[in-house]
């Protein structure tokens, strides 16, 4: 009799555990789609508050045209964040890379693009070596290089802005820039989805020690990703030059903040890991662009916009942070 009762109790206990697991699994599945629903809510909200003005072809074009550089740079940042790391030097890196591109554009376009990419890659390499070899947290390293590079950018543009060659701004047409952006997105998606790189990034983000024990070359992977992300930002500098035509001391200012907000709007867990998805990039950047444009159209001042974006950022970090692990930013 006792054994039967124990069996029944065990069945009830296992059933309760299974029920809780099913609930957690359902909540996890719902959370996957929250960023997409969030984008639709943001779009719907501003469609109502602006009387549909935000959905006019002109404003849609303006939203998209302002997002090419951000979308491209976000690809590299996504890879870094998937490892549980951060890069606060993106804006300053873009400014320096853009200055390099503008200077060499006076001689040859292809050479200028390559020079900008190399400049970004070298900065990424410096960040990676200090972070990995010096065993210093990534956000500390990149905050230092952010200020350093901002100073370099200011020195370069002290007397006057660095202008790109006149033909560069003639490349500013929507089909070309959209095609380039889609190409970068596809290459990044395919590389991280169908090669070992994507698995390694998530493994490092989830548990760096376990990844090392599993045979993943953590240090080499981190260095490679920071270099690649730097190269991507260097290429984004070319897009920035096409849009603006010159570089000033404020080039790329606050880009790192925009990228971070975009990532969390897309559902990116701030500590990376297995829950990072490439859709974080596309949904996040589009959500940020619509949110920013909508706030401008509603007539909010810059200060109020920053306040709202800050509140949204805190809410998204709280929602998508993985509290089930003890991982911190590396």
Feature annotation, model-predicted:
Residues 133-134, 138-195, 223-224, 243-249, ...:
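Transmembrane helix-bundle core of multi-pass membrane transporters
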Residues 233, 247-307:
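Transmembrane alpha-helical segments in multi-pass inner-membrane proteins
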Residues 187-227:
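Membrane-helix/interface signature in polytopic inner-membrane proteins
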Residues 2-72, 110, 216, 224:
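Membrane-interfacial amphipathic/re-entrant helices at transmembrane-helix boundaries
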Residues 52-62, 153, 192, 226, ...:
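Inter-helical junctions in multi-pass inner-membrane proteins, predominant
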Residues 108-147, 183, 283-284:
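Alpha-helical transmembrane segments within multi-pass membrane transporters and channels
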Residues 66-76, 92-96, 121-125, 182-186, ...:
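Hydrophobic alpha-helical segments embedded in the membrane of multi-pass proteins
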Residues 41-50, 55-106, 131, 263-275, ...:
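Single transmembrane alpha-helix segments in multi-pass membrane proteins
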């Amino acid at each position: 009799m006792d054994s039967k009762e124990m069996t029944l109790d065990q069945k009830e206990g296992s059933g309760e555990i299974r029920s809780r697991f099913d609930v957690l699994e359902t909540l996890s599945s719902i959370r996957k789609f929250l960023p997409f629903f969030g984008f639709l809510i943001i779009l719907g909200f501003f469609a109502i508050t602006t009387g549909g003005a935000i959905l006019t072809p002109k404003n849609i074009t303006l939203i998209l045209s302002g997002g090419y550089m951000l979308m491209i740079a976000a690809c590299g940042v996504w890879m870094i964040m998937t490892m549980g790391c951060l890069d606060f030097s993106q804006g300053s890196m873009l400014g320096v890379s853009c200055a390099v591109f503008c200077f060499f554009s006076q001689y040859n376009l292809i050479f200028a693009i390559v020079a900008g990419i190399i400049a970004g890659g070298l900065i990424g390499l410096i960040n990676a070596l200090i972070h990995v070899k010096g065993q210093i947290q990534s956000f500390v390293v990149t905050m230092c290089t952010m200020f350093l590079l901002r100073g370099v950018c200011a020195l370069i543009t002290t007397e006057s802005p660095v202008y790109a060659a006149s033909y560069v701004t003639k490349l500013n047409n929507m089909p070309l820039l959209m095609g380039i952006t889609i190409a970068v997105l596809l290459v990044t998606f395919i590389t991280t989805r169908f090669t070992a790189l994507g698995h390694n990034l998530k493994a490092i983000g989830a548990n760096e020690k376990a990844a090392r024990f599993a045979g993943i070359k953590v240090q080499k992977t981190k260095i490679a990703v920071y270099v690649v992300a730097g190269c991507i930002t260097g290429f984004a500098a070319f897009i920035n030059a096409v849009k603006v035509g010159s570089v000033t001391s404020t080039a790329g200012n606050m880009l790192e903040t925009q990228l971070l907000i975009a990532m969390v709007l897309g559902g990116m867990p701030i500590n990376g890991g297995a829950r990072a998805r490439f859709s974080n990039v596309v949904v996040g950047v589009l959500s940020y662009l619509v949110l920013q444009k909508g706030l401008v159209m509603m007539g909010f001042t810059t200060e109020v916009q920053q306040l709202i974006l800050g509140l949204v950022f805190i809410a998204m970090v709280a929602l998508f942070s993985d509290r089930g692990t003890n991982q911190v930013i590396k």
